[in-house]
Amino acid sequence: PIDGLLRKMVHVPGRLFSVAQWTVRNIPRLFARNERLICLFSTDAGPIVMVLVGAINVAAIETVWSGLVTPPRGKRITDFDYADTKKTYQKGEEMGRFNMGSTVILLTPPNVEWLSKFRAGQVVRVGEAIGSFTKKKNVL
């Protein structure tokens, strides 16, 4: 959503509950229980965290920098340090994909003004604007 430098990636194994609205409402802490790939970036607007959440029917999570990310044996959390690799990505550039589709959670600094047209659970397409930073006018 913004130009950034990849600092770290953490794979957290977990369940693969559906991320359909009914399931999200009825399974406590679903997004914290499902498999996740947490990607930390440094940006001009501050740190950005992109969390790719696995789900049922998601064949795999894949990133452009590491390829297919598969759960390790023993369900251990796997930490990947990219601090010294200078892996930079431009706004709008592909970061990763679900090989069936799922959910992305984006954590940003507090200086984001979200577009009012978006509602919880709404589908967002690649390249679609979702907001802007209030101090520096970068469109997310």
What feature does the model see in each segment?
Residues 1-140:
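Contiguous, well-folded functional domains in the mature portion of proteins
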